[in-house]
Amino acid sequence: MNATPASADDLIVIGKIYSVHGVRGEVKVYSFTDPIGNLLDYKTWTLRREGSVDKQVELVSGRLQSKFLVTKLKGLDDREEARLLSGYEICVPRNLFPDLDDGEYYWYQLEGLKVIDQLGQLLGKIDHLLETGSNDVMVVKPCAGSLDDRERLLPYTEQCVLAIDMAAGEMKVDWDADF
């Protein structure tokens, strides 16, 4: 494992190591990719945990097991050494992500956008998104200049999202501010 050469701003979290698997140094991983197996397409990971130095690791193999992945990392052959990686986020440089069609966005691109209703009122900024099964949900938290100090949950649907202006850092929504 090496110190990572990638810039911290360039890295996007795509998963998290949450425990060990077996006695040979394999780790269980929650994947944030869709489908979850896409995480295995990235062979070099930067592992990050608050208060620790980033580590660069190489993926040797991985397999789907229920709702998580079991992965083998190069040079990690011991259960106790693998246990030390629990809690690390798995990051990759954003330039490795596939290009999307027009009108499609990665979640990290939406986070931080100002959310403005049809009346021009600032509802807040997108803090993060949740996957609910039926549709994704944006968690909109108040920010400087917000209409009020309420947190809102807005569906990421065509009916709600009217327009996204990445250059302006804004999303226009069809949403009643009283909700």
From Swiss-Prot:
Its main location: cytoplasm. It comes from the Bacteria. Residues 102-179 form the PRC barrel domain. GO terms for molecular function: ribosome binding. It holds the Pfam family PRC_RimM. GO terms for cellular component: cytoplasm; ribosome. One of its GO terms (biological process) is rRNA processing. Keywords: Chaperone, Cytoplasm, Ribosome biogenesis, rRNA processing. It is found in: Cytoplasm. Binds ribosomal protein uS19. Belongs to the RimM family. The PRC barrel domain binds ribosomal protein uS19. An accessory protein needed during the final step in the assembly of 30S ribosomal subunit, possibly for assembly of the head region. Essential for efficient processing of 16S rRNA. May be needed both before and after RbfA during the maturation of 16S rRNA. It has affinity for free ribosomal 30S subunits but not for 70S ribosomes. This is Ribosome maturation factor RimM. It comes from Pseudomonas syringae pv. syringae (strain B728a).
